[in-house]
């Protein structure tokens, strides 16, 4: 079976000098290798092709046959690694929490342990008849986040 760590090393070494970074390497049954990349500027098809050829030059198909797919994460794909979070600062996110609640807001800051979102809540001021929008900062611990996606 193809070694996932070997593929991660090959990809990480190849990408070490550029803006493109590794998001995920998955190996599915039948030796189907899926490599996902991302970049602040987006990933072009030429980068995917070049990386695919580099991986093929490093992993011998004669020893073990495999299917290789190299692509970029979609704009609405869930955020998986810290660099994706960092690239989304000042972007609108939809964050699904482990308790089932959903928060939507602008990402202000990100750290390994927590994020800070700017959310708009409808709040009824004391003595007022109607609720008014109020901007609030919400800190969410990373462990409480089930999934987060960019809102386009």
From Swiss-Prot:
Q: What is its main location?
A: cytoplasm
Q: Which residues form the signal peptide?
A: none
Any Pfam family from its record, for instance, is RimP_N
Which superkingdom?
Answer: Bacteria
Keyword Cytoplasm carried by entry? yes
Can the keyword Plastid be found in this entry's annotation?
no
Q: GO biological process annotations for this chain's record? A: ribosomal small subunit assembly; translation
Which parts of the chain span the membrane according to its record?
none
Q: Where in the cell is it found?
A: Cytoplasm
Query: Which UniProt keyword terms apply here?
Result: Cytoplasm, Ribosome biogenesis
Q: Which GO terms describe its cellular component?
A: cytosol
**Family designation:** Belongs to the RimP family.
Q: Which PANTHER family match?
A: RIBOSOME MATURATION FACTOR RIMP
Q: Outline what the protein does.
A: Required for maturation of 30S ribosomal subunits.
Q: Which HAMAP family match?
A: RimP (MF_01077)
Name of the molecule in the record: Ribosome maturation factor RimP
Species per Swiss-Prot/TrEMBL record: Porphyromonas gingivalis (strain ATCC BAA-308 / W83)
* Gene this protein is translated from: rimP
